[in-house]
Amino acid sequence: ETLPHMRNQGWGRIVNVASVGGKRAVPHMLPYAASKFALVGLSNGLRAELKQENIFVTTACPGLMCTGSPRNAIFKGKHREEYTWFSIGDSIPGMAMNAETAANQILNACQHGRGEVFIRNPLNFTIALQQMFPELTNEMLAIAARVLPEMGGIGRRAAKGHQSESNWSPSVLTTLTQRAAVQNNEV
């Protein structure tokens, strides 16, 4: 319903928040990556179609965000191990970005009419690596898949992160994620 309003006023800005996962699929997150790839494709098409109407579409591709969201994310299989990986990764300084910093980068990109914004994140190098060396990148991701938890556990059933706690999570390793969960009302 927003697009007709933008057309009537003769301009507009649309921001679609996808993910670095919409540019590079990673093991154990394939449904997530598929949805983000679809959003990136939709945004690219909209950007091309709407530019002539002075409506700019920006696609934001953040990496890991330290928001505390793993507490409410859904995990399957060996849910405790999966949750541990995500909650620790969400807490590593320099790997995960806080929401305010990401929001400022997205807002800046929108204001300047940029087509895509890759929120500063160490994982962004995998996008360029994939484009230059697709086979090497796939081999590296296959190695990563081997260190992630195997299938099993609760099978197709699902558990939320807070139902998947273990000795490692919560722990001192997940302090930043725990703080972010409180700050962002994820508790």
Label each residue range with its predicted role:
Residues S35:
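Active-site helix of classical SDR
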Residues A38, L42-L46, L50, A60:
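Hydrophobic alpha-helix immediately C-terminal to the catalytic Tyr-X-X-X-Lys motif of short-chain
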Residues Q52-M132, T137-V147:
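SDR active-site lid
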Residues M140-V187:
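Non-catalytic terminal and boundary segments that flank Rossmann-like NAD(P)-dependent oxidoreductase
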